[in-house]
């Protein structure tokens, strides 16, 4: 298996783990791998009147996770979220951008409301 295929597989596994974690904490997954012209959102989750657009990063070690999220990636998620809000945001009061950090054999880390825009 080449590197790209392995990375894709690892990413999909991380997204499944993140979705599982969110469900255990009361979230309902309403979308996954949703693409727009502006970017892609890994998971869209809703709990009550809160809607979260979730970027999932999966790495094999802590050092890789530390550099996995940057302003450019968050800006793309925020742009995609803005485009998707009319479809998924009906009846919500709070909208936020979250990040899930996933490592093998470790508890996922859920960072909430990480993007505040410019």
Swiss-Prot record:
Pfam family, one: UPF0102
Gene Ontology molecular function: nucleic acid binding
SUPFAM superfamilies from the UniProt entry: Restriction endonuclease-like
Family assignment from sequence similarity: Belongs to the UPF0102 family.
Name of the protein this chain belongs to: UPF0102 protein Swit_0572
Species assigned in the record: Rhizorhabdus wittichii (strain DSM 6014 / CCUG 31198 / JCM 15750 / NBRC 105917 / EY 4224 / RW1)
